């Protein structure tokens, strides 16, 4: 029903309509706020997704950067590493007459000289083409992986025998004619069967007469005649022994007769020399060397007089081992040492055993040098007391004289 504008109902109806109109924008505002909140929430979700995506992108970029750095480092290490291989693929096209151009860091191998094992790794000494021998380097097997053919050839050369070495061994082992006998490992000469067969050394009692004995036997008549001509007295027993033996080449000897038979002087002869005041050295008789076809041994030194003195006076009935003054023409060292041992082994030989006391002394000046001679009273091995000069003791019993001097030493400390 249509109503006018002034109708109260109409007015009343219009009022609620206006109120409806007024409520509509409020509802619209609430819906807009809801939509804005939803949009904001969506924007925040998108922002978070964007942030997460950006973070993921940053992580990916960092990983890419790290991977790039690692690749760059690996490339740098590959460039800096001393890999020395020969690669035909890396070589540039070769012009005729010019050496091949290799990639950077690669060098051409001329030959392999030696091989060694260092710290458990196999290494080869490489000779580089175009470089001197002083530039050779030891390279591990890993650096020569592309040169297996050269390494195989080198190993084959090592395994194959060298003919030059065999020739050298043959030369060193071939004995030279007329050379010295071969030696053992320690340098000792190898003895032949002939050198091993040596005659066993006979016992001392079975030894034949030595050179001095043979000379005395052959020249016995000359020696006796010479002594008689010089006015010396020869022991009767010696003359009788020589006459009894005759021309025999071997003299039967008792232990006392093992002394050298060149010259034997009696006690009377010694006393005669002492009475006349002549020294023993002036009355020495030289025995001429044996002549004939007899062997006297090789001379190992110059001939000279070997003097054996014993100034002690033997008693009566001492037999043939009395005091001796011997001068022998030395022909060989063997005869000398043998006679010396025999002389020392004589059981009846008399010697000084003790110096009792000094008796007198005499001073003399010779060539402006004062010399003192001391006479001692000494005890002999046969129990007799004799007078002995210090010179005789020095010649025959030096140790006994030194021992006596040491016993007589006196020490007076100065205050």
UniProtKB/Swiss-Prot annotation:
Localization (cell)? Nucleus
Q: Does the keyword DNA damage apply?
A: no
InterPro entries listed in its UniProt record: Chromo-like_dom_sf (IPR016197), Chromo/chromo_shadow_dom (IPR000953), Chromo_dom_subgr (IPR017984), Chromo_domain (IPR023780), Chromo_shadow_dom (IPR008251), Chromodomain_CS (IPR023779), LHP1-like (IPR044251)
The membrane spanning regions, by residue number, are: none
Q: Where is the composition biased (Polar residues)?
A: 172-182
Q: Does the keyword Transcription regulation apply?
A: yes
**Residue intervals of the Chromo domain:** 107-166, 348-412
Q: Which SUPFAM superfamilies match?
A: Chromo domain-like
User: Which BP terms in the Gene Ontology apply to this protein?
Assistant: heterochromatin formation
Residue ranges, annotated region (Disordered): 1-102, 158-209, 273-318
**Description of its domains:** The chromo domain specifically binds to dimethylated H3 'Lys-9' while the chromo shadow domain is required for dimerization.
Q: How does it assemble?
A: Homodimer.
Q: What is this protein called?
A: Probable chromo domain-containing protein LHP1
Q: Which organism is it from?
A: Oryza sativa subsp. japonica (Rice)
| Source taxonomy | Eukaryota, Viridiplantae, Streptophyta, Embryophyta, Tracheophyta
**Gene encoding this polypeptide?**
LHP1
